From Swiss-Prot:
The active site is at D54, E126. The keyword Isomerase does not apply. Its main location: cytoplasm. It catalyses: Endonucleolytic cleavage to 5'-phosphomonoester. NCBIfam families: RNaseIII. The keyword Phosphoprotein does not apply. InterPro entries: dsRBD_dom, RNase_III, RNase_III_dom, RNase_III_sf. One of its GO terms (molecular function) is rRNA binding. Residues 163-232 form the DRBM domain. Residues 8-137 form the RNase III domain. This is Ribonuclease 3. It comes from Heliobacterium modesticaldum (strain ATCC 51547 / Ice1). The lineage of its organism: Bacteria, Bacillati, Bacillota, Clostridia, Eubacteriales.
Amino acid sequence: MKRAPNHPAELARRIGIASEDLATLEMALTHPSFVYENPQAPPEHNQRLEFLGDAVLGLVIGEQLFVRYPTWTEGELSRRRAAVVCEANLADGARRLQLGAWLKLGRGEEASGGREKPSILADALEAVIGAIFLSGGIEAARRFIVDLFGDALANAQNLVSGDNKTAFQEWVQRTGPADIRYCIVDESGPDHDKRFVAAVMVNGTVIADGQGRTKKEAEQQAAGRAMREWAGRKG
């Protein structure tokens, strides 16, 4: 993925950040590696905003789960919140916003495919949420988060933190036995920087695919996407 050529004002308009807060958005898109490799640049990177955005995200998702699922215990709410805001879901949301194209990365991260790394994308999304909160307050942040995580919130009862494959299997087999299989459909990159694409099939039909730096990561992402797709089909 190449860096977006345009000023982040375009992204700011899309996500609801005021024009006078563009500097905050730029900070949210600045990875620490860029600052370390460019000492002449402004010293701020996105880690503090990531901290703030993580707190805002946790609050909003917790609030939504509390209201939508009134019979859940504290433990159930905590587990499902962790599942909704897991790295895979955060990275998926960042990809839908095409945040990777807007990131400022150091040369090393750029060369190693940093614009596609789930951890970097997840951190950037949290930082952007922090920027939205500072620009527009909790209501603006809530609108953004609920819109971006709407599918995950609607399907929260079927999510299990850390193991999408198990959760998907349990969800599918509620309606009876099913043959669930995962296969690697694409593999690219040098040995030190592999990328895998996995597909998940139910009874021979491809439901979703996912990608990752390991086969396991790709399969987990495929399962997470498949849960949302399967829930939509059965809903």
